[in-house]
Amino acid sequence: MDLDHILSSLIYLSACFAVFVAGHMVFVLFRRSYSIKAELVEKDNTAFALVLCGYYLGLTFAIGGVIAGPSLGLEDDLIDMLIYGSLAIILLNLSALINDRFILSEFNIKKEILQDKNCGTGVVEFAIFVATGLNIYGALYGQGGSIFTAIVFWLIGQAVLVFIGKYYNLITHYNIHDHI
């Protein structure tokens, strides 16, 4: 392995880290009333820890979708990472809003996570972020696609996720929201 490969690997790693930091900042921006330090350190809020870990894991999968596949060269890859990484962050946070509205519609998510420290809600949010991250990975992975195709596949994935969430509640003999 020569110096050129090491430097390009460090550049790719730095770009991934920059996208991850940007994703964290957007997470904080979307949840201004949340204090990450207070919830994790002072209040020892396991439900919030689950939500945050799910977001980070989903974001990691989404970033993986951006960098997976054949390289087009360092410059083109970095441009793709900027464009599709930003798109992945936006889609992941939009997914949280969509899923909170349609899958966990009977909950006040903020109250369940921050006040009640409901780990059941935290696990569902964790799973939604991971599923959405994998969805974004699949939407962004591969060759020949465009932003439009990525958004279409993401929309299809979100529709399936919401449908399955609603359908599951219909086929069970109890209201899933009561048991979370």
Predicted features, each with a name:
Residues K37-V51, I109-V124, I176-I180:
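Membrane-interface segments at loop-to-transmembrane junctions
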Residues L13-M25, L29, G65, A88-R101, ...:
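Transmembrane alpha-helical segments of multi-pass membrane transport proteins and ion-pumping complexes
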